[in-house]
Structure formats: C-alpha cells, structure tokens
Amino acid sequence: MSMNLHGSAGLAMAELSAVGQRARRRVAYRLLPFVFLLYIVNYLDRVNVSFANLRMSADLGFSDRVYGLGVGMFYITYVLFEIPGAVIVERWSARKWIARIMISWGIVTILTGFVHTATQFYAARFFLGAAESSFFPGMIVYLTHWFCARDRSRAIACLYAANPAAALIGSPLAGWLLGVHWLSLTGWRWLFILEGIPAVVVGTITYFYMTDRPVQASWLPHDERDWLVKELQDELKAKNKLRNPTILEAFRDARILRLILAYFLALTGALGTIYWIPTFVKRLSGVSNQTVTLLLLVPALIGLAGMLINGWHSDKTAERRLHTAIPLLAAGSMFALLTLGRHNMPLAIVSLLLGSGFLYAYYPTFWAIPTMMLSEAAAAATFGLINSIGQLGGLAGNYTIGYLNDRTHSLTASFAFIALVYVVAGNLILSLRIRDPIGVLPRSN
C-alpha cells in the first residue's frame, strides 16, 4: 500500500513536472520572439541618431556639444515619465500601454527626419523621450508576469540580445541609407523616416497580439495555464512575506544606493559609447561612412554572443555579481587601453570595438539581481527608480563626451572618462552583497 502511494505520488509529480516544462516552453516560444522584435524596433529608433550623426552634424552645423546635449535631452523626459508608466503596466494593461508607446515614438522618430535647427533637434529628442518612457521597465514588469524566477534571467537576456541584434540589422541599413538622396532629402533624414514607420506598424500589432497575464491566455491549455498561475502565485506569496520599502527607506539602504550608483555609472559609459561609437570609429580611422557601419557589426556580434553566454552561465551557476562586474571591468580596460594606444590605429580600432562589445554582457545579469528580491507589487516602481536614475547617465555621459571633445579637440579625454565610469561601476557591483534581500525588510508583526 505504502509503495503504491509513493509510486502514485511520484507519478503525479512527474506529470506535474511535464506540464510545467510544456508551459514554460510554450510561453517562451509565444512571447520571446515577439518581445525580441519589439526591442529591435525600439533600439533602432533610439540609436539611429548615432549613425545619422555621421552626416547630420556637418549638414546642420552642430558642434559635438550640441549633438551630445540633443542626445541627452531624450533622457530628461524619459526619466520624468518612466515610473508612472511602469506602474500603469503593472496595474492596468501592458498590451495597451506598450502599443501606445510604440506608435507615439514611431511618429516622433519620423518627424525627427525633418529637423533643421538645434532647437528642433532638442525638441524632437525631448518628445521622443516622453513617448518612449516606461518601455524598458514596462517590459521587465511584463516578463515577471509570465516567467518564473529561474527563467527570468534568460528571458531578460533575450530582451537585451535584441540590442546587438538590432545593430546587426541597423548598421548596414544605415550605411546604405546615408548614401541615398531621394525627393530632395538626404540619407540621414530617410534614416529617421524609414526606421520610424515599423514602430507604428508593430505597435498596432502589439495591441492585438500580446496577452497581459497568464490567466487571460486562451492560447495556453488549461493544465498548463493552471500550473503557471499557481507557480507565479507561490513565488508572489513568498516575496510578499517581505515588506516593501518606501522611497526614503530605499535611499537609506547602502546596498540599494550602491546598486543605483553602479547602474548610473554603467549607463553613463554604455549610452555614451552607443551614441558616439560611429563618430569615434570615423575619426580614428578616416574610412567611409559605409565602412564605419560595417565595422560596427563586430561589437554587435561580440555583444550578442557575450550577452547570451553570460546570461546562460549566470543562470546555470546562480551567480550574478561576477557576471555583472566582469563585463564592465573588461569594457573599462579596453577604453583605458585606447588612451594609451590611440595613435596606433589598428590597436585603437580593435580596443574600441572590443570595449563596445563587452558592454552588452552585463545587462541581463544586473536586472536579475533586483527581480529575485522584490515583491511583484513593488517591482514596477523599484525597477523604475533604479532605471530612472540610471538613465540620467544618458544625459551625463553624452553631454560630457561632447563637451570634452569640443574642449580638448581630442578623443583621449572622452576615452579616459568612459574607462573610469566602467571601472568604478564594476567595482561597486563587486562590493555588493546580493545574497541578502535588497530593498526589502522583514514584515513587522
């Protein structure tokens, strides 16, 4: 009798495990390719200005400081509206809000193709930030609605892998468009116009394709849907035994402050690199715009491989700290080498491309840290808090690089600045004790 009971229990557990495997696989196949597509469109629209700048600043008479400030203007409104938008995703509808985001940013991107003055450029970037705000934290929150903790890092890695994948598409496309001249419009203008249209189209599709939560998923079989809902509810109950911190409590916790500062510095370097790397390669090498865009396939490939391998290995070993810090330190070392070997053109180009590729690998493992330690209700606002302060690095980094370029008439100071922020960010992550709950306190009696 006892053996039969144990055997029946074991069989039931095996069947339940099989249902769980099917549910996890079906969700991944349904959601991740579409999320990947959304982020490719997002990344293309966000960084096409870096390729456009190979011609735009010269055509419009912009200095490096004007370009850097214009790029940074995006992050002012992005930060202002990010937290409210992320909370809307949590409390209202990811499907409707993300569709709205994509359609509006596509329209603003198209209009950017018609700017003529610095003021118009600033305004276009300012409104693009407002349109796009909350897309990233909203997508992170959306993934927490569908993926269990053990799968989340790989899901986020898939999201971030769209960045270098988009560069693989965007670099040669930009190289071709920069050489066209249609309807009295130069190529950099067509770059904005033609890359804004897909956002409007895909945003419309998003409204009909996405499902907000598993309980609403008619495409999941009943047993798989029930398993996934229960699994996520069990995780939620465990997390909700911890009290969510207030904003003031978060700022009093040294670990949270360290995490916020590390992300701010990492994005100061990363966003500075992303928006300036075509200009850096052009000025270091003197090659054509088309060759620049082809060279930029190298960091995209390195970044794609590094991000997926790092995210996979981080999940396999259940280790986050080193998997986040090492890519930052590696990128910093490459930019430090640039300050020493800038006049050796082959060494400089290799260091620049490697450093730009390494920076992608830390993203998914960084975001796996807070997602494992926060309750779902607090996740939207907390992601927004960390990401909002971090995104200010986009303003700080791009304006500082433009200022240093204009002030010194050299790239050396900018390379040193980027190296410094990467190294400090990496060391802050190394100093972080992530085995203890971050930003949460035991529930009081």
Specify the residue positions occupied by each region the protein language model found.
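Helix-breaking motifs and short loop linkers at transmembrane-helix boundaries and internal kinks
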Residues: G61, S93, F114-Q120, A131, ...
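C-terminal transmembrane helical hairpin of 12-TM major facilitator-type secondary transporters
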Residues: R320-I369
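Conserved MFS/SLC helix-loop-helix module at the cytosolic interface between two early adjacent transmembrane helices
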Residues: L80-T119
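Glycine-rich segments within core transmembrane alpha-helices of 12-TM secondary carriers
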Residues: R154-G175, P198-A199, N387-G397
